[in-house]
C-alpha cells in the first residue's frame, strides 16, 4: 500500500502583502489539494512602506480574518498564522517586542534587503537579471561584498532569534551563482555556506 504524502505549507503570502490571491482562496486551494496543515505568513511591516510588505494598520484585520477562517474550516484543515519578518539591522528584526507580542503561531526570519556602502536600502530578492543590475549599480559590481553582507545579516538574525523558521535560505545562493558562474566551486563560498547551515542547526532551526 503506497504511503500518502502529508502535504503542508507554512510560507505563503496573500493580498495583505504581495500575494496574488486572498487568504480564503489559498485555504480553499490547500484543502482541494489535500493539505493537512497550512500556514499564512504575510510579509511583516518594515520601518518604511514598500509594495510588498503589510502596513501596521492592517494587522488587526489580518489577524481577525485568519481567526474567522480558522473557525470556518476547522473540520477540513489545520490552519496556523504567522509572519515573515525581515532582519534589516539591529533596530529592525524578528526579535523586537512589536513582533513577539503579536498572537502568532510562528514566525519566519528572512533577509530580503541589504544596505549599500552609501547607506541605501537595496532589495536583493529579485530575478537574477535585476540582481545583476543592482549589484553593479549599488555595490560597484562587488559580488563578494554583497554575499558577505547578506550572510552576516543572517548570522546576526540567528543570534538575535525571535523566529521559528529560516526563510528561503538559498535566496542569495541562486542569484549570486547566476551573477558569477563557478561561484559554487569557490572554496571560500563553500565554507561560508557550510558555516551558515551548521549555525542554523546549532540554533535548533
Which residues does each predicted region cover?
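An N-terminally biased module of ancient metal coordination in phosphate/nucleic-acid-related enzymes
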Residues: 2-89, 94, 99-101, 105, ...
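Domain-core and long-helix interface of multi-subunit machines
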Residues: 16-17, 103, 108-205
Amino acid at each position: 500500500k503506497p504511503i500518502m504524502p502529508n502535504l503542508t505549507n507554512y510560507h505563503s503570502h496573500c493580498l495583505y502583502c504581495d500575494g496574488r490571491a486572498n487568504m480564503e482562496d489559498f485555504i480553499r486551494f490547500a484543502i482541494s489539494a489535500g493539505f493537512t496543515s497550512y500556514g499564512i505568513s504575510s510579509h511583516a511591516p518594515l520601518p518604511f512602506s514598500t509594495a510588498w510588505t503589510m502596513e501596521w494598520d492592517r494587522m488587526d484585520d489580518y489577524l481577525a480574518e485568519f481567526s474567522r477562517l480558522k473557525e470556518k474550516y476547522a473540520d477540513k484543515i489545520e490552519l496556523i498564522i504567522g509572519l515573515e519578518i525581515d532582519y534589516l539591522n539591529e533596530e529592525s528584526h524578528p526579535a523586537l517586542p512589536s513582533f513577539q507580542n503579536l498572537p502568532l503561531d510562528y514566525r519566519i526570519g528572512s533577509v530580503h534587503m541589504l544596505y549599500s556602502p552609501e547607506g541605501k536600502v537595496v532589495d536583493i530578492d529579485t530575478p537574477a537579471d535585476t540582481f545583476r543590475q543592482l549589484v553593479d549599480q549599488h555595490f560597484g559590481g562587488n559580488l563578494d561584498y554583497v554575499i558577505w553582507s547578506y550572510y552576516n545579516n543572517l548570522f546576526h538574525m540567528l543570534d538575535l532569534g525571535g523566529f521559528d523558521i529560516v526563510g528561503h535560505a538559498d535566496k542569495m545562493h541562486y542569484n549570486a551563482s547566476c551573477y558569477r558562474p563557478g561561484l559554487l566551486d569557490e572554496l571560500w563560498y563553500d565554507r561560508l555556506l557550510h558555516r551558515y547551515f551548521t549555525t542554523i542547526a546549532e540554533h535548533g532551526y
